[in-house]
């Protein structure tokens, strides 16, 4: 195993932070951990502005900030203030959204404050498929709100936020991908990012809490679908994207062996980025999710710099640089190259 580097031997502070600005969500999506945990209300789920400022100000080389976790960012009451705070410091900032709360007024404000990117989750080309995956969502409202965001940009001649549609590909919605590419191109969207399920959750299961999402991932993962069928749908989606002028990003649908040089990690996250929950728990990346699975430290007890240079991070980096990665990484779609 690679030597654990603590203190001055640790890597420089991260250039990218992903902050869960709220853990509250207005939807309950079939593939999301939110659907398998107790409900979290808006007040309990919000990251305090004081913690947000402390993180931004305490990470001097920060170049990119993603305001995204298990919750819906538009439920964070200080979201616009957060975006303005980092834009004033020259930091690129954006987030993912289900767009249910993206009214025209909110769209106008996000454009005005200089949001760099906004990724809209849309996992179907029909209301039946989409609403079957995202409980409490409304397909027509999302379509209306996405078009409203495009209009808000046109109204002031703004190039940002860059808009991307994110499609989480599963057994139940794969067949609609070519139609989705064609549909969103008609709304002025020029980029679609297709992702696989984020994790198989097979590595750890505290008190049985992850049994439900583990069963879902096992049944719905593209790894369990006929590879020829997946390849055919991807090829048709690619042809459609070429025809309508949409940039299409497709994942591998079968795991790719992690090829690396000795002592080189299979993933760079713990060296250049960190994920922080709304309550201040520091985790090695955004794919870990539940803070009972892996935690590097708590910002209520130490600063990010001390946690970053601490023993827990050093041991995690050393394991990730070895032939036996941390158990939580083994089932991760980023590590397996299927995300």
Tell what function each PLM region has.
Residues 36, 69, 122, 196, ...:
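Residues that line or immediately flank small-molecule/substrate-binding pockets and catalytic motifs
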Residues 1-117, 128, 132, 140-141, ...:
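Conserved alpha-helical substructure of the radical SAM core
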Residues 79, 135-138, 309-312:
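Amphipathic alpha-helical protein-protein interaction surfaces
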Residues 78, 105-109, 173-176, 226, ...:
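Residue-level recognition of alpha-helix termini/interfacial anchor residues
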Residues 42, 50, 89, 112-302:
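Radical SAM enzyme [4Fe-4S]-AdoMet core and its adjacent flexible, acidic
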Residues 1-40, 57-60, 242, 253-262, ...:
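N-terminal pre-core extensions flanking Radical SAM catalytic domains
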